Amino acid sequence: MYDEERIVSGDSFEGEDLNEQSLRPQTFDQYIGQKLLKDEISVYIQAAKQREESLDHVLLYGPPGLGKTTLAIVIANEMGVKIKTTTGPAIEKPGDLVALLNELEPGDVLFIDEIHRLPKNVEEILYSAMEDYFIDIIVGQGPTAHPVHFPLPPFTLVGATTRAGLLSAPLRARFGIVGHMEYYNEVDLSQIIKRSAQILSTGIDDEGAHEIARRSRGTPRVANRLLKRVRDFAEVKHKDKIDTEIVQFALDLLRVDKVGLDRTDRKLLKAMIELYDGGPVGLNTIAANIGEESDTIADMIEPYLMQIGFIKRTPRGRMVTLAAYEHLGIKYNKEG
C-alpha cells in the first residue's frame, strides 16, 4: 500500500500547505529557479500591465512540489491583483464555478490546481468564461428551465496539473501561456534551502545545504520538508547549525539515500531486477507485484527515477538501467 506521507513525496501532506506559506516567495526577485519560464512570464506580465489588460490565461504543468501554486501567487502579486485558489475536484457542479467567478474583480487571478480533474460539465462552462468573459447556465428544471447570461470581468485563469495529457484539447487550447515546470538543479535547491533556513532562524552551512539538496529529488517541497526534519535532529543534538554530518545522520536514519531514493523507490527497482531481470516489464505487472496502484507508480514514483536515469521506457515496457544496478550495489549480468 502506498504511503501517502513518504517524506520524499512531492505531494503536500494534510495541513502542510499552511505551514509552507511563510516559506513561499512572493515576487520574482524572491523566486529561485525555473529561470527560463520565470523570465518568459515576467515579459508577459510587463506587457499586460503596459496595456492595462489582464494577463492571458496560464497553464503550468509538471511533477508535484515544484512550485506551481507559488508561481501562481507570484503572478498575482506581480500583476498587483488578488488571487483566489481552488482545486478541480472541489468544483463539483457549474454553480460552484459561477460562485467563484462572481467573486473576482477585474484582472484577478483564479488558480485551479489539479485542473485535469474538473468535471466535464464544469469544464464546458469554463470555455466561454476564458474566451469571452461570460457564462450561460440553465436555471430551473423542465418547462421552467431557461438560460441565464452572466457577464464576467476580465480575469486570468492559472491552471496547474501534474498530468497535462489528461486535459481536453478544447481546454488546453484556451491557455495562451503554457509553462513546463522542471526539476530543480542542486545549486538552485541549495539556495532555496538556505533562504528557508534563514526564515526559520536556523543556521546552516553551504555543505549542509548541498547535502540536503542532493537528496531532495529536484523538488523544493521535499527540500523544505527535509530541512525541517534535519533541523529537529540538529536541535536535539545541540548543534548550533546544520552541517553535512547532521544531515547525513538524520537522512540516513530516515532512509533517504544520497540521491533521494527511499524505501518505496528501492522496493520498485529491486522487484524489477529480482523478478523480471531488470525488464522490460509492463506497468500493471510491476504494480501488481509490489502492491501499488499503477497510477501511483506513474505519477509519484517513476518520474524521478526516469529523471535520474534509473528507469527507461521502451516499446516493450520499463527497464532498469545500469546506473540503478550500480547505485543499489547489484551485479549487472545483461549483455549488450
Curated annotation (Swiss-Prot):
> Molecular function terms in GO for this entry?
ATP binding; ATP hydrolysis activity; four-way junction DNA binding; four-way junction helicase activity
Instruction: Please tell me one Gene Ontology term that the record gives under cellular component.
Output: cytoplasm
EC numbers listed for it are 3.6.4.-
Which EC main class describes this enzyme?
hydrolase
Which positions are annotated as binding Mg(2+)?
T69
Top-level taxonomic group:
Bacteria
Region Head domain (RuvB-H): list its residue ranges.
258-336
Task: Supply the domain comment.
Answer: Has 3 domains, the large (RuvB-L) and small ATPase (RuvB-S) domains and the C-terminal head (RuvB-H) domain. The head domain binds DNA, while the ATPase domains jointly bind ATP, ADP or are empty depending on the state of the subunit in the translocation cycle. During a single DNA translocation step the structure of each domain remains the same, but their relative positions change.
Q: Which family does it belong to?
A: Belongs to the RuvB family.
Q: What's the stated role of this polypeptide?
A: The RuvA-RuvB-RuvC complex processes Holliday junction (HJ) DNA during genetic recombination and DNA repair, while the RuvA-RuvB complex plays an important role in the rescue of blocked DNA replication forks via replication fork reversal (RFR). RuvA specifically binds to HJ cruciform DNA, conferring on it an open structure. The RuvB hexamer acts as an ATP-dependent pump, pulling dsDNA into and through the RuvAB complex. RuvB forms 2 homohexamers on either side of HJ DNA bound by 1 or 2 RuvA tetramers; 4 subunits per hexamer contact DNA at a time.
Identify this protein by name.
Holliday junction branch migration complex subunit RuvB
Organism the protein comes from: Ligilactobacillus salivarius (strain UCC118)
